[in-house]
């Protein structure tokens, strides 16, 4: 079983990375229980047509009866199939006063024995220091420190950008959760959770307020198919054209830039002069009247200069380019072959 304390300042992405882990567990077919208000149909990897997610909504501050009601998270011995329990605003549960509260003791005991019930747990707190030391020692197997990369200023480049534009250099909204094995920042890093903000913002209520007077008990979310998918109607041609116009208007600048680059590349490719290919014209020769005018030997290679009946000199390299095969016999005798023709040429 894995227990995570996810920490970070306000807006650092604690809930977002936790919803990302919920999505991963749903895709793996695992059971989920949480006090977060989720919109399952907006999870990118789940979608509105999913029929199998098993997600339970528990009260904002669950009692022991609520935790007992969610049952087992995994009936097998394979811990990769463990269910995931995600609880936000846990700072009020694990401070020194609450840790020794007799009414909260059964809940704490349940957390200590959650492994036997097949549950992985994610606790969300703003800072680990507000958690009682005994609770940290007993439960904080992993501690996750959340950071938002768009709030970080790049050295030199960010300063130069601010001087030129007068504003902070925009960076992608990437949320990073650094997972430490232990409750110290010096503990070894075991993994990093990386999630982009935009595709998960609509999957949960970012303005959810937690209350001790939550009036509903434990209930199960409807699957996305039952709540949204079965009511989906395919778009007709007019609606598709309307969406096309909207997206073309939205991405018109990028599209025009891409078309400009493509047009310039195509024009340069078409108008580029093609290299001239030298064609070697094969001629026929009367090798009966050829004689070897000179010969040259360099290591294992030979070169000959032939003379025809008119006194014209032709070297062996030109003949080979025209497809003739020249076989050395001796410095004064060669065999010239092409196709079925084979002639012996000697010195004069």
Swiss-Prot record:
Residues 1-252 are cytoplasmic. It is found in: Host membrane. Signal peptide: none annotated. ATP binds at residues 8-15. It comes from the Viruses. One of its GO terms (biological process) is viral extrusion. Keywords: ATP-binding, Host membrane, Membrane, Nucleotide-binding, Signal-anchor, Transmembrane, Transmembrane helix, Viral extrusion, Viral release from host cell. Pfam families: Zot (PF05707). It is a single-pass membrane protein. Belongs to the inovirus G1P protein family. Interacts with G4P; this interaction results in a complex that spans the inner an outer host membranes. This is Gene 1 protein. It comes from Enterobacteria phage fd (Bacteriophage fd).
